[in-house]
A protein has these predicted regions:
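Glycine-rich, Lys/Arg-enriched anion-binding loops that position phosphate/diphosphate groups
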Residues: 129-231
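N-terminal catalytic cores of NTP/NDP-binding nucleotidyl/phosphoryl-transfer enzymes
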Residues: 1-59
Length: 296
């Protein structure tokens, strides 16, 4: 069995606090000749325990992508948070990680809890690791502007559409990776074709409105974008939230391909226009704003 150094946590947003933990994981893995790994769950434990939906900053796809791309984590383990996992005693939980995944070292945040009824804490983690000859690092909280970096705080920024402040606390831009879907092609009728993405279930949609974005294509290219998040009130009566992006200077068909949209700045709230021509003029103005953003 290959040796692993395992980062413990849920990692929603993969923010600066998580980054400190994941960097230490990669560092320890290099020292020990092990694989840097992260152990997390396929859904929030709170959602299972309370039965209430929990809205996350990122999909599992984006959580994994951020950990791999930014911090060099080579193995992300999404364990099902089921009844067996929920009722597993904390000691059995650690023994499972060692026996099943070859853990030789753990890295956890200062407030990490684990095991049945969250009975395990970092003091018990240190104690158990010492007994078993396993290494352990506990990472202190990271602060920004006197505020502790947390997923909870960053969710409020994303919901408010404050993408620049969110990026400061995340350590990277907020992103959405999804497969391009067929839309109604209304953008084409006004000379502004868009690619359409869906917001995954139980993932936060940013505040409705228009954003400057940068879009990463499957072939490695990147394009400036103008992205509308919302219900498209000018052309639709549906309350379904969609993410539609116009790619500046791009021509081609991206249906069925996966894109990553990174949110840079919110330009305005979502508006209802009386005519498609008025909508077209406003989008053209937003395109000019996006061009100016990337030229600055």
């Amino acid at each position: 069995m290959e040796k692993t150094v395992i980062a413990l946590g849920f990692f929603d947003g993969v923010h600066r606090g998580h980054g400190a933990l994941l960097r230490k994981t990669a560092e320890r893995a290099r020292e020990l000749g092990a694989v840097p790994a992260a152990f997390t769950f396929d859904r929030p434990p709170k959602e299972v325990v309370t039965g209430q939906p929990v809205y996350l900053i990122n999909s599992n796809r984006d959580r994994q992508g951020l950990m791999e791309r930014l911090y060099g984590i080579e193995r992300v383990i999404f364990a099902p948070f089921d009844r067996e996992m929920m009722t597993m005693p904390w000691e059995a939980y650690l023994e499972m990680l060692i026996g099943t995944y070859g853990a030789v070292h753990f890295v956890a945040g200062h407030d990490h809890r684990f095991g049945h009824k969250n009975a395990g804490n970092v003091q018990l983690l240190r104690q158990k690791c010492a007994e078993m000859g396993i290494g352990c690092d506990i990472i202190p909280p990271v602060q920004r502007e006197g505020i502790t970096v947390s997923s909870t705080y960053i969710r409020t920024l994303v919901e408010a559409g404050d993408m620049e402040r969110a990026a400061d606390f995340l350590g990277h831009r907020h992103c959405l990776s999804q497969t391009v879907q067929h839309g109604q092609r209304i953008g084409r009728t006004i000379g502004i074709p868009t690619v359409n993405l869906a917001v995954p279930e139980h993932v936060l949609a940013p505040a409705h409105g228009v954003y400057v974005t940068e879009v990463f294509l499957p072939d490695g290219r990147r394009c400036a974008g103008v992205t509308n998040v919302g219900t498209r009130p000018t052309v639709s009566d549906s309350d379904r939230v969609s993410v539609e992006t116009y790619l500046l200077g791009f021509e081609g068909d991206l249906y069925g391909q996966e894109l990553r949209v990174e949110f840079c700045r919110r330009l305005r709230g979502e508006q209802r226009f009386d005519t498609l021509e008025a909508l077209r003029r406003e989008i053209q103005r937003n395109i000019q704003q996006a061009e100016a953003y990337f030229e600055a």
